Amino acid sequence: MKKVFAWLLATAVLPLLCCSCASDVNAQNPAPAAEKKLRVGLFVDNGASGNGLFHLAGLIAHSPQAELVTLMGSDIRAGKLKDIDVLVMPGGGSRKQCNAIGNDHLEKVRDFLRNGGGYVGTCAGMFNVLECRMKLLPFDRYLNAGGSTAWVSVEVNQDAAKILDIKPGIRKVRYSGGPVSYALANSKSEGKGISLGVYKSSVSRSKEQEGKFIGSPAWIYGSYGKGKVIATSFHPEYEESTHDMMLGCFYAVSGVKLTPVFPKKNYRPVRVGLLTSYAGGHKPIELMLDLERHPDIDLDYVMATELDKGILKHLDVLVVPSPQKAMLKKFFATDLRKKQFAEFMNNGGVILDIGEAEGAIQPHKNFIKLPKNADVKKYILK
């Protein structure tokens, strides 16, 4: 009987001891906390434009390591840079971007960097880095030395390879009017910087311009206070073939490697174009991400370049989110545009307007004006 009692006591106490031991072990080795996401602020106000803005938003938002925050100039003036880790200034117009922030408030960007923030700029975003704008790194630009949209050759030097964790060599990249820059011996900038590689080919309009273009820094990197700055004169965000360069830029300023996972699509999804011309702001980005995440919607970004290549022949629906009525009216006013959109709608294509395209595009039964708060997905999937 004593043996039975001892056995029962042991079996009752053993789980308690095990639980106690486990508690001690857990107390000494607590479960790892969830990894904090990199908070990336994307500037979407006036001066941020074009497909590049939406490509950047997709790369960031679809990366599990990052959280996308869209920023207007008023957000920066209100001190919201303190809530992010990296500021991204996209292509568009650098003067307009600075004006949207307010020239009296550009010091907030510099303070953000002094305190350890990161800065990533493409095209206009590189203009902002230069002596002529925010004075973040000791570089400036030649006047009227750039060119039109084209594929050009860019060097990835040994510094770039190490800083971005990519392979050195010569790469083909998309260029579209970015700054042709040069290093300054005497600069007003507090920052220190280096070239990550130079242009090896040119789209300049003259021999004189070409002499400035070839051999000029295509991208630059440096420090400003405790923060890090990287900027590209070209557009690595556009094409999958250069995404490693774009993602390397985020790594260079944050130490975090973004690995975007794009939404999978079902067989034969609805082919949708998003007109990105004049479409900055929070809502167009939110709309883009909402559409892109749906498995039955295959989304393309559309500007004049894509229209000229005949993209409307491959779309079922075109969504127009821009609120800039005067600019849209001018955009759709040419005989070529009128013909393109008439053929698109006559052949069954549908235009969904949640912006201000009404009156800019000729009336048609397939032109549908939607309420501002409409669920665009529902109309597309009808």
What is the predicted role of each segment?
Residues M1-L9:
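Bacterial N-terminal signal peptides that target proteins for export
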Residues L8-C18:
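Bacterial N-terminal signal peptides
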Residues C18-A33:
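Bacterial Sec-dependent signal peptides at the C-terminal "C-region" and cleavage site
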Residues P30-L38, H62, R110, R133-P138, ...:
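Extracellular ligand-binding/catalytic regions of CAZymes and related secreted enzymes
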Residues R39, S49-C132, S277-N366:
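Helical hinge/lid and interdomain linker segments adjacent to catalytic or ligand-binding clefts
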Residues R114, L130-V173:
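Class I SAM-dependent methyltransferase SAM-binding "motif I" and its flanking Rossmann-like core
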Residues V154-T242, K283, K369-K382:
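Catalytic beta-strand/loop cores that center a nucleophilic Ser/Cys/Thr
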